[in-house]
A protein has these predicted regions:
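Accessory carbohydrate-binding/adhesion or oligomerization-edge regions at the termini
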Residues: 1-56, 136, 140, 217-219
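Accessory beta-strand-rich segments of carbohydrate-active enzymes
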Residues: 1-2, 6, 28, 32, ...
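Short hydrophobic alpha-helix segments
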Residues: 113-115, 226-228, 272-274, 298, ...
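Extended acidic/polar, glycine-enriched regions
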Residues: 130-134, 198-282
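Surface beta-strand/loop "capping" patches
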Residues: 172-202
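N-terminal carbohydrate-binding accessory modules
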Residues: 179, 258-327, 346
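Substrate-binding/catalytic cleft of secreted carbohydrate-active enzymes
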Residues: 323, 332-495
Length: 495
């Protein structure tokens, strides 16, 4: 239903939904038989139909933009639920793993929040609104929003709740953030681990006498242990007395971190298991090195895709893709052009697949018009108005995947030109996580920023001669061909 004709008050507790249809979640609304399926490459889908320009780039941005647009399909979801017994009395979190493209959320008639960024988990604390029984969850999903200027990827344009929606409960003291930083010598003979933790607590809970027990195991063998007091923010340093085995694509050795939280009465209230590996990544003498050796990348770009269900994929789809990659000696993947399901990164850790973790950003239609480079109103570019919203996507990507050994590169996005905002994105990663490399191809289109954005020279579809020319003329950076053959449908014959 178009935004202007949507049932505006559907979230009210007494609103009659007897005329509503049923839909499976997760699922794209289009593949449930509503709206039209659109496939678009570089242009924004409204070009030629409605005039729109991003905020901060032109005096006139278009009448009504998306909320009053003549075409902006909207899905109104209603779900009734009771709390499971295990959630009663706990802080309750509502989690959307993927919602395209913008959502408004209500619980029992009360507005809970709004979220954009289709491919990043959005979570809401619904404790003040939820009851033990008879809850009414309402979600309004808009196909287009201001986020549309940043999500112009070359793919089918869907909308809806296309990943899982979950409820989970928090204990009285909960580890809300965890950063595990393994450190090792190139031969693995010396190793240590820094772990930073942040916690939240319930209104009646106390940190008094609460403690954390942190263990590092190799299989069933304990190789390091530390016990520390719990507070809102604390850390633990593990010293490892024996050599460790380094992680790589041929032998993706993982160790087990186990964190146990005890309250002031000595009761165990939370256990956090995590698998991590020891490895190093750096650039030395113009060469990318993993564990001190030259890194050889045999990689692919991977969209999340199932021929029947679109970007609504299953665990079996992920397992099939991993097995296919290993069969074909593929050792690296770029999450083009958005964060994947969180389970994918764990699979890459276990399988030894090097990951280039990409931010959900592509603004192709703002700087390339009908094939010509014309960046007069590109976003995010150097438009300060867009900086915070883009940095939010950068931070989300970092916080979600910072503990994954397989992530060697942070990628700033895809085909979004270059400017001061991309420069700030690069700076965020370099300051926050200097132990990884940053990738971005867009500076190829704007060389003014090649010294401030990306640790590597990245190009797309370059013929071998152009690659050779770059490498033979005192290259500033290592070269990565981040895309080399467009494989869509029954294609890839050019390889």
């Amino acid at each position: 239903m178009n935004a202007k004709k949507r049932p505006v008050s559907f979230y009210e507790n007494d609103y009659d939904i007897s005329e509503f249809d049923e839909i499976q979640v997760p699922q794209h609304i289009e593949l449930a038989g509503y709206d039209k399926i659109h496939y678009i490459n570089t242009m924004y889908p409204w070009e030629g139909h409605e005039y729109r320009r991003p905020a901060g780039t032109c005096n006139h941005i278009g009448e009504g933009m998306f909320s009053e647009a003549s075409y902006n399909p909207t899905g109104s979801y209603v779900r009734f639920f009771d709390l499971e017994e295990a959630l009663i009395g706990k802080r309750v979190i509502l989690s959307f793993e993927g919602a395209e493209q913008a959502i408004y959320v209500w619980i029992n008639g009360e507005f809970v929040g709004y979220a954009e960024d289709s491919f990043t988990v959005s979570e809401f604390d619904i404790t003040p609104y939820v009851k033990e029984t008879g809850n009414r969850l309402c979600v309004e999903v808009h196909k287009r929003s201001t986020a549309a200027f940043l999500e112009d990827q070359d793919f089918f344009r869907f909308f809806g709740l296309f990943r899982d929606v979950n409820l989970y409960g928090l204990p009285d003291i909960h580890v809300s953030d965890l950063w595990i930083r393994p450190k090792c010598a190139l031969d693995g003979r010396q190793a240590s681990m820094e772990i930073e933790l942040k916690t939240t607590k319930g209104k009646t809970a106390s940190y008094a006498d609460a403690r954390a027990e942190i263990c590092l195991l190799d299989g069933h063998q304990m190789i390091a242990k530390e016990e520390v007091s719990v507070s809102e923010s604390f850390r633990a340093d593990l010293t490892i007395s024996e050599p460790v085995q380094l992680w790589n694509c041929d032998d993706p050795k993982l160790y087990q971190v186990e964190i146990r939280i005890f309250d002031g009465q000595g009761d165990l209230i939370e256990i956090i298991p995590y698998q991590v590996g020891f490895r190093t990544i750096c650039i030395e003498d113009g060469i990318i090195k993993l564990n001190g050796r030259r890194l050889i990348i045999n990689g692919v770009n991977r969209h999340e895709w199932n021929a029947k269900s679109g970007r609504c994929i299953s665990e079996n789809d992920e397992i099939y893709d991993i097995e296919c990659m290993k069969r074909n000696n593929i050792n690296a993947v770029r999450t083009c052009h958005y964060p994947d399901r969180t389970t994918w990164y764990y699979r890459c850790d276990e399988a030894g697949i090097y990951v280039m973790a990409e931010v959900n950003l592509e603004s192709h239609g703002s700087w390339q018009k009908m094939g010509a480079v014309e960046p007069s109103w590109n976003v995010p570019g150097s438009v300060e108005l867009w900086q915070d919203v883009v940095l939010d996507r950068v931070k989300s990507n970092f916080e979600m995947f910072k503990n994954h050994t397989s992530v060697l590169f942070w990628s700033l996005g895809n085909e979004s030109y270059a400017g001061e905002v991309l420069k700030e994105m690069n700076a965020y990663y370099k300051k926050r996580d200097p132990g990884r490399l940053v990738h971005y191809e867009g500076v190829f289109q704007n060389r003014d920023y090649e010294d401030n954005i990306s640790d590597v020279e990245s190009q797309m579809y370059a013929p071998p001669g152009r690659v050779r020319e770059y490498l033979e003329n005192e290259p500033k950076k290592p070269f990565i061909l981040c895309e080399y053959m467009h494989d869509m449908g029954n294609s890839l014959g050019g390889v």
